[in-house]
Amino acid sequence: MSSSSYFVNPAFFPTYPHAGEQFYATPSGSYELSSCAFSKNPKTSSYSSSSSPSLVATSKPPCTQQLGAATFYGGGTLSNFSTTAGYGDHSTTSAGYGSMSQPISPTSAWDSRMAATYNSASWGSTAAELGDGSYRGRVSALTAGTGCLVSAAAEPNNNHCSQVMSPCKSTSGYPWMPVSGPNVGLEVGRKRCRQTYTRYQTLELEKEFHFNRYLTRRRRIELSHLLGLTERQIKIWFQNRRMKYKKESKNKEEGGSGEGEGENESESTGTENAQPQSAVHGVTILEKPSSLVLHVDDTVGLNAVRHT
């Protein structure tokens, strides 16, 4: 394919046939075209009316457009490729729309069709309009389904497209997104372990807490050098120890107040249940809210009762 656009080169600008120029039958039973869209020859190729799937070309010059050799991802090289070819049997057809110098394997048929579509005349305008300078760069696209990176690179000399498929990698779009997969533990940073203190460190910290519940910055630095701990670890230990001390003191206060209240309640209930009794000279007086009852012994006379 030349570097000039199809507006300059008349070969890329198709000439449409007139309304009267249609297919017409020949005495031999074949059908011929009235004119070719990409050639100046009036009659170029014919089609056989037989049931054979292969295409038969007449002795007339074929209607083909010479394009640059294209190298495909699946393998194989295509030369003398027509702008309207691509639907026949590549392995058996040797004439007709175009000829192939090397057959393409069936496994790479889809790749070759895609590459042929890029090199066809329908897409030739895009490559020609962009020019060699702007079409040399790589075009990268991330497919939505699998995340495979497809890059199409164009060489400046022969302007053929080669598709390079990179291996699919299921990577997250942003670094802060969670990583899913079998190797999650290896990629994610190791979780911070809980700090364990030795008996010596705990004893020194307890002694310091007994004298000072709050440490100054200077004393905290001294303890960090003495015990081999960081200032942050010492600060957190003192915070936890103060919370523990507050909880213990609160429980003690609740326990002491509960015992005192229990003793007072027992005393009050005992006094309420006990009935006040008073004996004066052998007379027992039972106090009741409704009336006063006197029990007089037989040995005591009425004088004693009057005296009371």
Curated annotation (Swiss-Prot):
Region Disordered, annotated ranges: 247-280
Gene3D superfamilies recorded: Homeodomain-like (1.10.10.60)
Top-rank taxon, per record: Eukaryota
Chain span(s) of sequence motif Antp-type hexapeptide: 173-178
Subcellular location: Nucleus
PROSITE patterns named in the record: HOMEOBOX_1 (PS00027), HOMEOBOX_2 (PS50071)
Protein name according to UniProt: Homeobox protein HB1
